[in-house]
From Swiss-Prot:
Domain of life from the UniProt record: Eukaryota
Domain bHLH span(s) in chain numbering: 149-201
Compartmental location: Nucleus
Chain intervals for the UniProt region annotation (Disordered): 1-46, 212-278
Key word Metal-binding present: no
Ranges annotated as spanning the membrane: none
The organism's taxonomic lineage, starting at the top: Eukaryota, Metazoa, Chordata, Craniata, Vertebrata
Record's signal peptide: none
Name used for this protein in its record: Protein lyl-1
Residues bearing PTM Phosphoserine: 274
Species whose genome carries this gene: Mus musculus
């Protein structure tokens, strides 16, 4: 602690130095505050602690009598603005750099290898649904062989079904008559022409059936007269033979070994009609 006499001497010395500074510079500029004041020397700290006993030790006190030289002053604020401190550089290095709009991940590049698109994408992910490729499916389901086997079986079955459908359309196309025989038709045209051709065949079959049902009535009515004609001709032939036998003359003595010469009556042939003729 300083005695009262030392306090008075220090106070008078500080007053005199202050007056001298004010006289030398009538309008002094306010002292520029250094950007980062350097550490105080040991002598200044000891002098402050000894001359200001009413303050606790370690409290910085500005002493006008012990100023630093002009050459040792810190750079001005203008230069320090271009050279930021290490703390500011560390803070800027930790923050993520801002990206422009065209540097953000594009939603079309969203895949297993690149990862999902960020929140700053041009389009929302809910509106764009891209079908994953075979390589991505193999990579995602590589540890699940059951899914891989099921997918392979489904693909082969679909391929087999498509081949059979195409083969059936090709066979149906061969049965359809077209003006250019080698004209290429789509599946829709093949089905439409097949319907028309089937309808034409149905109408043609109905017409043929109607002609066959109405035709045999006329020949059936002509059969009975033909039978009667056969019966009449048979009867006419039998009567003609009877009349010829009757008109044949009988010679005298023409007897079969009859010594008396008596004439025997000639037996008339009575022809009976067979049941077939009747």
């Amino acid at each position: 602690m300083c005695p009262p006499q030392a306090r008075a001497e220090v106070g008078s010395a500080m007053t005199e130095k202050t007056e001298m500074v004010c006289a030398s510079s009538p309008a002094p500029a306010p002292p520029s505050k250094p950007a980062s004041p350097g550490p105080l020397s040991t002598e200044e700290v000891d002098h402050r602690n000894t001359c200001t006993p009413w303050l606790p030790p370690g409290v910085p006190v500005i002493n006008l009598g012990h100023t630093r030289p002009i050459g040792a002053a810190m750079p001005t604020t203008e230069l320090s603005a271009f050279r930021p401190s290490l703390l500011q550089l560390t803070a800027l290095g930790r923050a993520p750099p801002t990206l422009a709009v065209h540097y953000h991940p594009h939603p079309f590049l969203n895949s297993v290898y690149i990862g999902p698109a960020g929140p700053f994408s041009i389009f929302p992910n809910s509106r764009l649904k891209r079908r994953p490729s075979h390589s991505e499916l193999d990579l995602a389901d590589g540890h699940q062989p059951q899914k891989v086997a099921r997918r392979v079986f489904t693909n082969s079955r679909e391929r087999w079904r498509q081949q059979h459908v195409n083969g059936a359309f090709a066979e149906l196309r061969k049965l359809l008559p077209t003006h250019p025989p080698d004209r290429k038709l789509s599946k829709n045209e093949v089905l439409r022409l097949a319907m028309k051709y089937i309808g034409f065949l149905v109408r043609l079959l109905r017409d043929q059936t109607a002609v066959l049902t109405s035709g045999p009535s006329a020949p059936g009515s002509r059969k009975p007269p033909a039978r009667r004609g056969v019966e009449g001709s048979a009867r006419f032939g039998a009567g003609h033979r009877v009349e010829a036998a009757r008109s044949q003359p009988v010679l005298p003595g023409d007897c079969d070994g009859d010594p008396n010469g008596s004439v025997r009556p000639i037996k008339l042939e009575q022809t009976s009609l067979s049941p077939e003729v009747r």
